[in-house]
Design a protein with these regions (language model features):
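Cleavable N-terminal export/targeting peptides
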Residues: 1-26
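Transmembrane beta-barrel domains of Gram-negative outer membranes and organellar outer membranes
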Residues: 19-213
């Protein structure tokens, strides 16, 4: 089963930096850092997703608020380790016919090893492991499986534009034996435009392919 989602509103973020930021070019530079998933910057983005055509009969819909704290750790002169957590807060209706549910979903924890300086042609990248943690508060909101796999992100920033893609694949290795195994590929291309007044406009799409479906 392939599921598509459109993030209609993305990245209203609170950021903490070691330096004070001023208006103008400094604020614009900070906004561009926020557009980079592996920037050396502590941030807490909030992402709102609406999914339609969901569930057994394709009549359901789901709203998800993803809380996505990003915390960088310096590893020597040349590398950063970026912790990126996605904690979903969910409400869904008619995913199971005639029902509605709300609560926390499963947490996805990623770690990206990323060079501190861009590579040739301005390429920024990060690679590492991703883990699925069964933190869902209700059975219908959780896979009830532990999972792991690889993840990567690659992007380029040119002028006011940031374009890139984030991807991962997760296989389950433990959890409720009565639930289906997890084998999913996630793909998220994204495009960001930052104005001179440090306002960011973000468009991204999310696709998940369930190899067990």
């Amino acid at each position: 089963m392939r599921r598509g989602a459109l993030a209609l509103l993305s990245l209203i973020a609170a950021a903490a930096t070691a330096q004070e930021t001023a208006s103008g070019s400094d604020a614009e530079a900070l906004a561009k850092q926020l557009a980079n998933p592996v920037a050396s910057l502590i941030s807490v983005p909030f992402q709102n997703n609406w999914d339609f055509g969901y569930g057994r009969d394709d009549d359901g819909w789901r709203y998800t608020l993803n809380v996505q704290p990003v915390i960088p750790f310096s590893i020597g002169k040349n590398w950063n380790l970026i912790s990126r957590t996605i904690l979903p807060i969910l409400y869904q209706d008619d995913v199971l016919p005639g029902t509605d549910e709300s609560g926390l979903g499963d947490t996805v924890q990623s770690l990206f090893l990323s060079p501190k300086e861009p590579w040739p042609f301005g390429l920024v990248w990060g690679v590492g492991p991703v883990a699925l943690l069964p933190t869902g508060t209700r059975e219908v909101l959780s896979a009830e499986k532990w999972g792991a796999g690889p993840t990567l992100v690659a992007l380029k920033q040119a002028g006011p534009w940031t374009a890139g893609v984030l991807a991962n694949h997760i296989w389950s290795f433990a959890g409720d034996g009565d639930r289906d195994d997890v084998s999913t590929t996630f793909l998220q291309p994204f495009l960001n435009y930052t104005t001179k007044k440090a306002t960011g406009f973000v468009l991204n799409t999310e696709s998940t392919y369930d190899w067990q479906g």
